[in-house]
Design a protein with these regions (language model features):
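Catalytic-site microenvironment of enzymes
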Residues: 1-252
Length: 252
């Protein structure tokens, strides 16, 4: 046997190489366990507080502006939703944003839901209640001059290519509207609620289930007072949150 020859040196070398290979290969597997490639993604919800800036929307007998009520509710709702969902607001302060940009934001963010928030306005102070709109090319109600809000329900005069986008989601939008109404009716702040289809411009180009919520009539003295109350807005927001949860539970 020649000097320096060790019969087990080759075996040891092979074992060490094998162990090294195993250790190297195991590293990506460990990383994969820590951060799964197919980790569940949060659903994206775009909340659209109506009006803003010079566009005040409707105003109540006590001078409450619709733009302020819609933003306050959107902020409260966003805070309630953000632990479960990715939430984006079309505006976060008192500034103007044109109506077409609102759905553009939702489309750009690839939102799973678009909810536009408004308050009703009427020259008839007794007008009351909550209305949930989904997009429909033919209005299910007569939009009369009683509507005093500065175009909260701006409609399109004729169908366009954009109409076809929201039409694809009409069934899902109706489901969302019904689930929201069910939850809203569980609270007794407002006496009535209804669901209507209308060719609303704010919903027309949304490429996802979308609704427009009119959360009571700000021109009704009693409802204006309710809409000034943070606890009332929090209850409304909670009802909307439950309706959204119900929707994703139903359509998943």
């Amino acid at each position: 046997m020649s000097a320096g020859y060790h019969p087990f040196s080759i075996t040891r070398y092979c074992l060490l190489m094998g162990l090294g290979f195993i250790l190297i290969c195991s590293q990506p597997l460990q990383a994969t366990r820590k951060e799964p490639i197919f980790a569940k993604q949060k659903k994206t919800i775009v909340l659209d507080p109506g009006h803003g800036g010079h566009d005040t929307g409707a105003s109540g007998p006590e001078g409450t502006f619709e733009k302020n009520v819609t933003l306050e509710l959107a902020r409260i709702l966003a805070a309630q939703l953000e632990n479960t969902y990715r939430v984006i607001l079309t505006r976060t302060d008192d500034y103007f944003i044109d109506i077409l940009s609102r759905t553009s934001i939702a489309n750009h963010e690839k939102a799973d839901l678009f909810i536009s928030i408004h308050a009703g306005g009427s020259f008839l102070h007794q007008a009351s209640g909550i209305t949930i709109y989904f997009f429909n090319e033919i209005s299910e109600s007569v939009l009369t001059p009683d509507t005093a809000s500065s175009k909260p329900l701006e409609t399109i005069d004729h169908p366009s290519d954009w109409s076809n986008i929201q039409n694809r989601h009409q069934t899902s939008s109706k489901i969302l509207a019904n689930l929201l109404q069910k939850r809203i009716n569980e609270q007794t702040i407002f006496e009535k609620s209804e669901i209507l289809g209308a060719p609303l411009l704010v919903l027309e180009g949304a490429d996802m289930p979308a609704v427009c919520l009119e959360i009571g009539y700000i021109t009704n003295p009693a409802e204006e007072k309710s809409l000034q109350d943070i606890s009332v807005l929090s209850n409304i927001a909670q009802s909307i949150q439950h309706g959204i949860d119900d929707f994703f539970e139903k359509v998943r």
